[in-house]
Amino acid sequence: MTMFSTRSRLRSAAADTFALVVYCFVIGMIIEIVISGMTFQQSLSSRLVSIPVNILIAWPYGLYRDAFIRFARRHAGEHMWARNLADLLAYVSFQSPVYALILWSVGADLEQITTAVASNALVSMAMGVAYGYFLEYCRKLFRVAGYI
C-alpha cells in the first residue's frame, strides 16, 4: 500500500486527526488553566472549540510536519536533534496562529492570548517534540504505511 492510495490517505488522516485532537485537548487545558490563568469554563470552551478546528487542520498539519522532517533529513541526516528541531519548528509555526484565533473566539483577552500563545510556544520546545512522537505512535496504531 503506498502513501497515495485512498486507504493509506484515510488511515493517515484518521491517525493525524486522533493524535491532534487528543493531544491538544489535554495539553491545551493544562496550559490554559495552570499557566495562563484562564478559568476552567474558558479553557473547556476553548478546548471544545478546538476539536472541530483540530479535525479540520490535523491532516494538513501532519503533511506540513512531514515536510519539515523530510527537509531536516535531507540537510542533517538522521540526527535526532534535527528531527526534534523540525518537530518543534513545525508545531510552533503551524499551531500558534490557530491557537490565538481559538482563544480570541472564546473571549480570552489580549493578555491571556499573548500569555497562552507564548507559554504554548515555550512549552512546545518539549511538547512539540513530544507531539511528534505521539503522532508517530498514533500512525503506527492506525497502521499508516510510508508516511514520511
From Swiss-Prot:
<dbReference type="GO" id="GO:0005886">
    <property type="term" value="C:plasma membrane"/>
</dbReference>
<keyword id="KW-0472">Membrane</keyword>
<keyword id="KW-1003">Cell membrane</keyword>
<dbReference type="InterPro" id="IPR010574">
    <property type="entry name" value="Ala_export_AlaE"/>
</dbReference>
<dbReference type="GO" id="GO:0032973">
    <property type="term" value="P:amino acid export across plasma membrane"/>
</dbReference>
<comment type="function">
    <text>Exports L-alanine.</text>
</comment>
<dbReference type="Pfam" id="PF06610">
    <property type="entry name" value="AlaE"/>
</dbReference>
<comment type="similarity">
    <text>Belongs to the AlaE exporter family.</text>
</comment>
<feature type="transmembrane region" description="Helical">
    <location>
        <begin position="115"/>
        <end position="135"/>
    </location>
</feature>
<feature type="transmembrane region" description="Helical">
    <location>
        <begin position="18"/>
        <end position="38"/>
    </location>
</feature>
<keyword id="KW-0029">Amino-acid transport</keyword>
<dbReference type="GO" id="GO:0034639">
    <property type="term" value="F:L-amino acid efflux transmembrane transporter activity"/>
</dbReference>
<feature type="transmembrane region" description="Helical">
    <location>
        <begin position="88"/>
        <end position="108"/>
    </location>
</feature>
<keyword id="KW-0997">Cell inner membrane</keyword>
<keyword id="KW-0813">Transport</keyword>
<keyword id="KW-1133">Transmembrane helix</keyword>
<protein>
    <recommendedName>
        <fullName>L-alanine exporter AlaE</fullName>
    </recommendedName>
</protein>
<keyword id="KW-0812">Transmembrane</keyword>
<feature type="transmembrane region" description="Helical">
    <location>
        <begin position="49"/>
        <end position="69"/>
    </location>
</feature>
